[in-house]
Swiss-Prot record:
PANTHER family tied to this protein: SODIUM/POTASSIUM-DEPENDENT ATPASE BETA SUBUNIT, SODIUM_POTASSIUM-TRANSPORTING ATPASE SUBUNIT BETA-1
Stated family: Belongs to the X(+)/potassium ATPases subunit beta family.
Keyword Transmembrane helix in annotation: yes
Gene behind this protein: nkb-1
Primary localization: membrane
Keyword Metal-binding: no
Membrane topology, from the record: Single-pass type II membrane protein
Residues bearing carbohydrate: 140
Protein name: Sodium/potassium-transporting ATPase subunit beta-1
Subunit architecture: The sodium/potassium-transporting ATPase is composed of a catalytic alpha subunit, an auxiliary non-catalytic beta subunit and an additional regulatory subunit.
Gene Ontology biological process terms in this record: intracellular potassium ion homeostasis; intracellular sodium ion homeostasis; potassium ion import across plasma membrane; sodium ion export across plasma membrane
Coiled coil start-end: none
Phylogenetic lineage: Eukaryota, Metazoa, Ecdysozoa, Nematoda, Chromadorea
Length: 320
């Protein structure tokens, strides 16, 4: 007679069985969570749970202590004032970038300076940005010192207690100061030109016979000359007269840059005296020193922005 096989049966060592092989294997999930018979919770006794919890507490405490020790050792090797790696061959590099103001945070992707001469509201944001940017030069007076012709920030590297040179904003009084609305009201807008801060960087002077033609009549040893022109032939025809303040560009006495409280970044301004009305002019401004490279593709040593001064009647908004 053929033996009927139970579909739910399993074979253990060739012997058919329909029950668990061990008495302590739970039959239901509820028994797995709490087995009253064996006194276990999720398969472990109270003693077993206590041992494994203590083990992992000690293990992770040791791991955290080891990580904190490594972090402390690493932080001790860092200088809070100077990057660990800077200069040639690093991301920071040795070629300072060129920046400009006013740059509106509300339009971070735009390099256009556009306003209407007849509408004060159209250039209010530019005036506010210029004022905000220049405020830092007044607020650090007690942490800076006046530097004469023979003084410079070289003292900061020699003496850590020395104060940085105070930048004098009076060089912009003739047409590019807050009193004259930075020239925007009169249609002669001023733009701030600055260099990025590079630790330890200072301008290298050109030899007398190697000064670029663009700045030959304004170049002064020890300074960074600035030259702005139209980006294209058409722009060069329209840009008109450009005035530089100071005429020699950015004064070299404020270099090298050292990370210290009260440091004031030197700047220059360019004023567009005869820029045409209702025409867009693309401007290219370059900084000149022997150790500043120029590359159009990567925009090294230069900055681009657009200027458009409109002279149109202000359209009054009609109330609905």
């Amino acid at each position: 007679m053929e033996k009927k096989v139970d579909e739910n049966a399993t074979l253990m060592n060739g012997v058919e069985t329909t029950g668990p092989a061990r008495d302590d294997v739970p039959e239901t999930f509820r028994e797995f969570l709490y087995n009253k018979k064996n006194g276990t919770v999720m398969g472990r006794t109270g003693k077993s749970w206590f041992q494994i919890i203590v083990f992992y507490i000690i293990f992770y405490a040791f791991l955290a202590a080891f990580w904190l020790t490594c972090l402390t050792i690493f932080m001790k090797t860092l200088d809070p004032k100077v990057p660990r790696f800077y200069g040639k061959g690093t991301i920071i590099g040795v070629n300072p970038g060129v920046g400009y103001q006013p740059w509106l945070k509300e339009r971070p992707d735009s390099t256009l300076i556009k306003y209407n001469l007849r509408d004060q509201k159209s250039y209010k944001a530019y005036l506010e940005q210029m004022k905000t940017y220049l405020t830092k030069y007044d607020s650090n007076a007690t942490e800076t010192r006046e530097c004469g012709a023979g003084d410079s920030n070289d003292d900061l590297e020699k003496n850590p207690d020395a104060l940085p040179c105070r930048f004098d904003l009076s060089v912009f009084d003739k047409g590019c100061s807050e009193k004259s609305d930075f020239g925007y009201k009169s249609g002669k807008p001023c733009v701030i030109i600055s260099l990025n801060r590079l630790i330890g960087w200072r301008p290298t002077d050109y030899q007398e016979n190697s000064v670029p033609e663009e700045v030959k009549d304004r170049y002064k040893a020890g300074s960074i000359a600035i030259n702005c022109r139209g980006a294209t032939n058409v722009d060069q025809e329209h840009i008109g007269k450009v005035t530089y303040m100071p005429s020699n560009g950015i004064d070299g006495r404020y270099y090298p840059y050292v990370f210290t409280k009260g440091y004031q970044q030197p700047i220059a301004m360019v004023k567009f005296d005869t820029i045409p009305r209702n025409k867009l002019v693309i401007v290219e401004c370059r900084a000149y020193a022997l150790n500043i490279e120029h590359d159009i593709s990567s925009r090294l040593g230069m900055v681009y922005f657009e200027v458009m001064v409109e002279d149109k009647p202000v359209e009054e908004k009609k109330e609905l």
